[in-house]
Design a protein with these regions (language model features):
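Short C-terminal tail/terminal secondary-structure segment
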Residues: 12-15, 105-108, 254-290
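C-terminal substrate-recognition "lid" of short-chain dehydrogenase/reductases
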Residues: 25, 92, 131-134, 142, ...
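Substrate-binding pocket helix/loop in short-chain dehydrogenase/reductase
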Residues: 109-111, 118-123, 223
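Active-site helix of classical SDR
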Residues: 134, 170, 178
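Alpha-helical segment proximal to the catalytic Tyr-Lys
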Residues: 139, 183-187, 251
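Residue(s) in the substrate-gating loop at a strand-loop-helix junction
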Residues: 154
């Protein structure tokens, strides 16, 4: 019996890798962000869920009681990102993980037809938002002497042709920023890494591929048909990667891009995603979130 209890205790420790840790997750109200909130809480973390989608964010926080607090956050506004970080410290006493995940897909289509203002919006959310998250996480983590900064890139940040021009440029930039931050902050005990999801079933990708954010099953079938493994990525897959990078299991992982794509990028990807979605995205609305 004692041996069995000891085994159960070890298993519990393995599944509670984030026990006592505090995280800020942007883009937390849906998709990858919401999946990561669930995973982090399951592994023992307290979470500040930051998102511009207020109603969904408050509903998410209500599921977890005191373990999750929501704050409305537009990641293009520095004072709002700073407030999310400050809330983590005020509410939970520290900040162990900053997950820069908020995003949009931007306008899909030929570069000659891309409105400059839409380009600016895409870059502001996807790249400036990550910069602000890194900046204010560093403000807390440097004196703390520890921390993990995780930023969501994409397979579009590894290859071209898998997203809009603004999206692709920003996601390449996220990888560069993650590496640059890693090289600066490592001496302070702070790690910085990026995750590059492949095709992942969310409301945003459903909008791009089907024109309807609710057609998740149809989206999954299409993604599975294009996957080397024959399966579609789910938010939980990216959440698992984030939990690993946030944990002490990844203590030597720094400046890394963790590609979670079922092998898509090993074969050069494909450009059907951007071409098939362009018309439908314009009709459905271009600012759907992760």
């Amino acid at each position: 019996l004692d041996a069995q209890l000891g085994l159960l205790e070890r298993i519990n420790l393995m599944t509670k890798r984030l026990e006592g840790m505090v995280a800020v997750i942007t883009g937390a109200s849906s998709g990858i962000g919401a999946g990561t909130v669930h995973r982090f809480v399951e592994e023992g973390a307290s979470v500040v869920a930051a998102d511009i989608q207020e109603q969904a964010g408050e509903a998410l926080a209500a599921e977890f009681g005191e373990s999750v607090v929501f704050i409305r956050t537009d990641v293009t506004q520095e004072e709002q990102v700073a407030a999310a970080v400050d809330l983590a410290v005020e509410k939970f006493g520290r900040l162990d993980c900053m997950f820069n995940n908020a995003g949009i897909v931007g306008v899909v289509g030929p570069i000659a037809d891309t409105p400059t203002e839409d380009w600016d919006t895409t870059i502001a959310i996807l790249l400036k938002g990550v910069f602000l998250g890194c900046k204010h996480a560093a403000r807390v983590m440097i004196p703390q002497g520890s921390g993990s900064i995780i930023s969501t890139s994409s397979t579009a940040g590894v290859l071209g042709g898998l997203g809009s021009h603004g999206y692709t440029a920003a996601k390449h930039g996220v990888i560069g920023l993650a590496k640059s931050v890693a090289s600066e902050l490592s001496e302070h005990g702070v790690r910085s890494n990026a995750i590059a999801p492949g095709n992942t079933v969310t409301a945003m990708t459903a909008t791009v591929t089907t024109g309807d954010h609710e057609k998740l099953e149809e989206t999954a079938e299409g993604m599975a048909s294009r996957s080397m493994l024959g399966i579609a990525g789910q938010p939980e897959d990216i959440a698992a990667a984030a939990a690993y990078l946030a944990s002490n299991d990844a203590r030597l992982v720094n400046g890394h891009v963790l590609v979670v794509d079922g092998g898509q990028t090993t074969s050069g990807g494909n450009n059907r995603f951007i071409k098939s979605g362009s018309g439908m995205l314009r009709e459905a609305g271009k600012w759907d979130r992760y």
